[in-house]
Amino acid sequence: MISGHLQTPDSSDHSGDEAKLTKPSGLESKTNELWSSDLEEELESRIMQPATFSSILKQFPSISEETIISKIMSNKNCDKNNWKKKIYCYRYFLQPSKEEPDVGNMKSLVEKLEKLKLKKWSASEIEQLFCNYLEDLTTSAVKVSIPGKTLDEVAAAVNNIHPRPRWTRKEIECLIKNENDFKKLEKDLFVRDLDSIKKKIRRDNLSIQNEIQDSEKKSPQSTDSNNKDSSRDLSRKERDQLKKLLSKPICFSELLAKFPGHSWEYIAREIIQLDSSEDNTIWLKKIYYYCVVYSISVDKEITKYIGGGNRIYEKVRSDWSKIKTLDFFKDWSLQEFERLYCFAFHDLTKSALTKNFPSKNLNDICKVVNISFPKVPYTDREMKYLERHLDTPMQTLENNLPFRSRGSIHKKLEALKALTETTEQKQPPTKTRPKNEEEKNVENAAYMKELIMFDLTLEAIENTFPSEPIEEIIKEIKNSEIFDPLSFTRGEKELMAKLVKKGNLIDDCFDYFPLREEEFIRSKYAEAEYVSGRKMKFNTPEERLAYEAKWTLFNMGKQEYGRGNRRSTKRYCEIDELSKLEQEASVKRSKKKIELTEEELEQRRKRSEHFRLCRLKKLEEKREKYRIEKAKRLEKIAAGLIKPSTSGYELKDIVTSAEYFQSIVGDKQKVQEGQKRKRIQTEYFAPEFIEKPKAVKLKTTKRQAEKNKIKKQLKREAQLKIKKKKTIAPKKGKRRVKTNNGIIEEIKDVYKLSSEPYVESEVEEEDEEEDYISPYDPPDIISDSQVKLNGRHLYISSFYKELPEIPELKFVSLPHMEMSGNDITVAKQIMTTANDDILYDDCLAYEIVAQHIKSYRDLPISFPPVLDPITHELNSANIVRIRFFLYPEHYESFMLASPKSNELDPVHEIAKLFMIQYSLYFSHSDTLKKIITEDYCHKLEHSVEENDFGEFMFVVDKWNQLVMKLSPNLASVQNILGLKEDINEAPRAYLNQQEVSIPTNSDLKIETFYDEIMYESASPLFNPINSNLEIDSESAPIPLGEVEIPNNVIEEINEKMPDNYIPDFFRRLKEKTEVSRYAMQQILLRVYSRVVSTDSRKLRSYKAFTAETYGELLPSFTSEVLEKLNLLPTQKFYDLGSGVGNTTFQAALEFGACSSGGCEIMEHASKLTELQAGLIQKHLAVLGLQKLNLDFALHESFVGNEKVRASCLDCDVLIINNYLFDGQLNDEVGKLLYGLRPGTKIVSLRNFISPRYRATFDTVFDFLSVEKHEMSDIMSVSWTANKVPYYISTVEETIPREYLSREETKETSGKSKSVSPVGEIENVAAAMMTPPTDSSESEIIKN
């Protein structure tokens, strides 16, 4: 049977097999057969820890006691002498029936431990105390192992065993670890005083040093481990938190999340050192499983640093390789695998697995666990479940324990039942000598006196005398001389107050006070109820009267308890009667109305009228009397017989002011007679005005200036309308007589004079206010807004590796500016073609100015002219080149010129390039934002305004120098330095030698950039000092020749980049959770200005007011709408009628749509889309951003296009600019989108649903619910500057009832979108016609 059981694959639990060992001890051969190497390892790990013998037996409940003893004694690594003593202690206190021979003078120690029972120490606590006494007397270990006792009680017990206990191994380790920290040693070694600790250190100094040297020899990697763990040590609070977490069933990754400032190696080592559990290999396995699952390399040094376990690590690696071969491996996350591995140690019940892994199959869970644990030991939760369900049917147990077989559960149940029986039988009888009757009586009398003095509640009596009948104790207390039946003890008062606060009724309180009479308890309840709070609200006056009477009666007699029972009994009866009266009076009763006859009603009216007339008569008499007295008084005042009365307040004010003016210089001190007035110089206090530095504002762009102008015009018009409404006179039938104001207004109308001067002033005041800037249209980084990344990777994938790297790009040169056959320059053709070629010199901006030279004028006179004065050709000294941060070998060329109209502005483009690269790489720092805006953008614009070409070139050189200093692409920087090429030599040659300024490190503020980018500030001495520096001795003679100007040593030295700069730079990029909306929109506008703006005339050649008329949705429109829809990186986007692809590019770049597409039929617009797509991908590559996933259908109509239909049905958000769609084209859109998923959003410029719309059952419009919105800002579309409305349509599950007629409602009830009705319903095309639009939509379309 035994061998057959071992071969059963389901019974993988070795503890089920160990149930065989509960048989008699004569079967030692069978026991040896069942004893496995895993059990041997587990037992060895247990006995090497400070554990009691009873805890070892509980861990192996199915194995006999003799077997475990023999295994412990046969182990070579354990301290056999200590284990003999622990076994003796266990059998003496927990198995007193067995007699053991004396081991190492144990009888004397046991007699001392026996005395602890008198101090209410249990047998298990005594055994644990003895274990700590032998192996670990540190504070942390005692607190964990004996939680029911204080440290003072434990120290007293230890001193009772021996006044000078020997030093345990753990105490010596603590002493070695904290040799110089006496405060910590005194706290951690609570049994020892400070003198004994110091003596131990002095006496055993040599041995301690030897132990330290031995430990260093054994662990030569200690210095390496310190280098690995560069973080600070755990604080005391963090260490306590870590100890608490170790006892919880959590995995290693969850524990690491609680301590983010420390490395995993350091936390792992601390766990192994602090782990006081019986099996300390559990956390070691969790740590190595974490390393294997998350592909963290572990070498021999790390294993030694953590604490060993090479064999465990190799086993975990082999198990993980097997798990990877499972079919369902890809459906699980790494965190789920790690959590399941953790659950295998703590809880493998079905309820826990289904709760924590709801989406996983139980069979898959079993497969994963069985690979890592071929023999799964019973977890603590499984054991507790079996202990609680010993009598539960076997089928229920098998269902709730999926990893256990029927035989394994049966054996475990038998072992648990046998263990409970043996523990009940093995209760240790008291070995103390029996007490005399006199001693018992004296002890009981002391306890009883303490009860009578402090607490006579039922709970206190039962706790003090648990084994004696409660009736006898109550009789003895009542017969005691010191017992007072008419006074509550402190414990009884506190209990009564608690019962009253909880709201317990008085009848429920009698049982808590067994020594008190019922009447006395009632009085005390009333007293506590009164003390707790007086009643303030009453339903009726009678209830209030009864309550106050009871309260008065209670106060009158509460001190008369000792006068006799007759009076108190009468008072209590009165209180009860008043309580009943109060309860009856609290009920509101409505008064019965008395019905009166007509005669009685007439008499009542006469009486009320009579009383009213009498009151009026008396009031009139009083008024007449007051008039007469007032007239007489006024006559006397006029005759001078009575002085007018003065109020007391007026007199006080006069006296106070007189005293003030008599004071000395206003010090409120009255001048005495004969005192001279002091002459004190007057002090004048002027308020201090601190001028706040004005924030630097960048030059307003033409678009922003146009928006501000339009907003002001709209405000003026609104104010004029309000003014006109106020001046319009109301219509009246009679002829109105003209007033002076009316005549003045008529004159102003005739002579056309301005009648609203205040309106202009109001407008001027409003002009001075700051203009509102929309968050969806930021003009610069100062007023920028952020877009959430929502978990997407903004940069290329190589930036997110453990060792980030910058990929190489294929840069090509362009020797001459040439035109290709299709009127496109070679440079533009290279940059817009869909391949990997990128120009070293991106000269598209230069070509725009060169090809439209008539639209530009020269900058101020200090700047080079656009044309060479001699050759009248383009001036090469006017070309400025700007480098890129990630690829310094790539730069962009600009021809310096001022646009006459709305053309590309080179100066603004350079500033824009500065701000884009700040937003992408340094946006985490406001300090760097200030440097970029003030030192670069603002000074660039200021140099043009102030006609200073020298300052302009200084800013350009400073930027290029900064890129060379900060670029993480070290290979490119070295190549550039090797070539020694000056890309801006020609424009710099235009300046005089005195105007040329070379930027220094202080100009670049390079230290500030390092400090802001790096997580830890670089030391000012991170660079080595030049070796050629020499220091003269003090005694050396001073030469009398010419004194040379000393070099700036700091600028010569600080040329080296800090070591952690590049890793910290890429770490900043990885931790980005938001991206600049300004940067995203400007990247799109840069591409648009180089491709579409130069070739936009053909877009206006289409017929006006048709579906092919071209109109654009500007970036602010797309940003606001898509943010309102919350477009996520996991969603798809499509634009029906995408034009040149602007919205498609923006959805992919700004919001990270995983797929962004569009359909366009116009030839020229499709061609421009292809050029824009090629250029934007190359711009993103140079900036280090991810490529866009685009899906265009160009040169095609969406009508009847299955490819476009498939793309639309798969997307989550659609934009349709149907501003000029006719009814037939709208109908085609509905049929094309028929079948969209519920929840899909459609954005349109006009409503697809007309008034009184009826469902046709062949279009998506049947399922739309429409919401109307309006743009928050002006100039969001290309054809009007006003705020435009737009519509968001949501695809519903079913057809709304308002779209159906009564008959159709009956027929289609219960039908949803998935089952469209197919009936003989005519397709009413008129229902799909575009409805009448709002007034705001009726504007003339501007081409």
From Swiss-Prot:
Region (Disordered): 1-29, 210-236, 418-439
PANTHER family associated with the record: HISTONE H3 METHYLTRANSFERASE, HISTONE-LYSINE N-METHYLTRANSFERASE, H3 LYSINE-79 SPECIFIC
Protein name: Histone-lysine N-methyltransferase, H3 lysine-79 specific
Enzyme class: transferase
An annotated GO BP: methylation
Modes of activity regulation: Ubiquitination of histone H2B to form H2BK123ub1 is required for efficient DOT1 methyltransferase activity on histone H3.
Native source organism of the sequence: Candida albicans (strain SC5314 / ATCC MYA-2876)
Other noteworthy facts: In contrast to other lysine histone methyltransferases, it does not contain a SET domain, suggesting the existence of another mechanism for methylation of lysine residues of histones.
Record carries keyword DNA repair: no
Catalytic activity: L-lysyl(79)-[histone H3] + 3 S-adenosyl-L-methionine = N(6),N(6),N(6)-trimethyl-L-lysyl(79)-[histone H3] + 3 S-adenosyl-L-homocysteine + 3 H(+)
InterPro entries associated with the record: DOT1_dom, H3-K79_meTrfase, SAM-dependent_MTases_sf
Localization per Swiss-Prot or TrEMBL: Nucleus
Compositionally skewed regions (Polar residues) per UniProt: 1-10, 420-430
Pfam families: DOT1 (PF08123)
GO MF assignments: histone H3K79 methyltransferase activity; histone H3K79 trimethyltransferase activity
